[in-house]
Regions:
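Lipid interaction determinants
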Residues: 2-8, 26-107, 113-160
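N-terminal secretory signal peptides and thylakoid transit peptides that target proteins
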Residues: 8-16
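Bacterial N-terminal signal peptides
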Residues: 15-26
Length: 160
C-alpha cells in the first residue's frame, strides 16, 4: 500500500500509531536499562567490601580512572597528585560527530570517611559527586550511600 495515496485521516492515524510504538519501545528500553543496573545489594551478596579511608588514600593518587555510563558514554582521567586532572570522554549515542569526543577539566579529593569526590567541568555541564568505594574481586564500584542496599552502583576501572 502506498501511504501517500491513502486518505489524510488514515495517514494521521498511521503516524500516531507509529509514534506510539516508538514511545512505548523507548520507555521499555529505559525501564530495562534501569532494572538491569547493579544495586549495592547485588555486589554485597557476592562478597564486595567497602574500602577503608586508608585503602582509598593508597589507591587513588596517580590512578587512571575509567567509567562507562548506562548509555555507553566512556570517561577517562588520571588523578594527579595535585588534585587536578584533564578528562576525556566519548559519547557513541550522539549524532553530532564533533560532540562524540569531548574534554573537561576536573579535580578530585578524598572526602569524609574515605569518599572519592570528583568535580568535572565538561563543555556543556558540570558534574560533581562523592562516592563510597567497594571492591569485588578485581573490580571497583562507587555508590552514593552504603546505607541504601537499593542504591545503584557504578563500576569504575581504577589502575596504576
Amino acid at each position: 500500500m502506498d501511504i501517500e495515496k491513502a486518505p489524510h485521516s488514515f495517514r494521521r492515524s498511521f503516524n500516531l500509531a507509529m509514534l506510539t510504538v516508538a514511545i512505548l519501545g523507548a520507555n521499555a528500553l529505559a525501564m530495562a536499562q534501569e532494572s538491569s543496573q547493579l544495586k549495592l545489594r547485588d555486589i554485597l551478596g557476592k562478597g564486595a567490601r567497602q574500602l577503608s579511608a586508608d585503602e582509598v588514600q593508597q589507591l587513588l593518587p596517580e590512578a587512571k580512572v575509567m567509567s562507562v555510563g548506562a548509555r555507553g558514554v566512556t570517561r577517562r582521567w588520571r588523578n594527579n597528585a595535585d588534585g587536578k586532572f584533564v578528562a576525556s570522554g566519548y559519547d557513541p549515542t550522539t549524532t553530532t560527530p564533533r560532540m562524540q569526543n569531548f574534554q573537561g577539566q576536573g579535580s578530585w579529593h578524598i572526602g569524609d570517611n574515605g569518599k572519592y569526590c570528583v568535580m568535572l567541568e565538561w563543555p556543556r555541564t558540570t558534574e560533581q559527586w562523592c562516592r563510597i568505594l567497594f571492591k569485588l574481586d578485581d573490580k571497583y564500584y562507587a555508590v552514593k550511600s552504603a546505607d541504601d542496599e537499593n542504591a545503584v552502583v557504578h563500576e569504575l576501572e581504577i589502575r596504576h
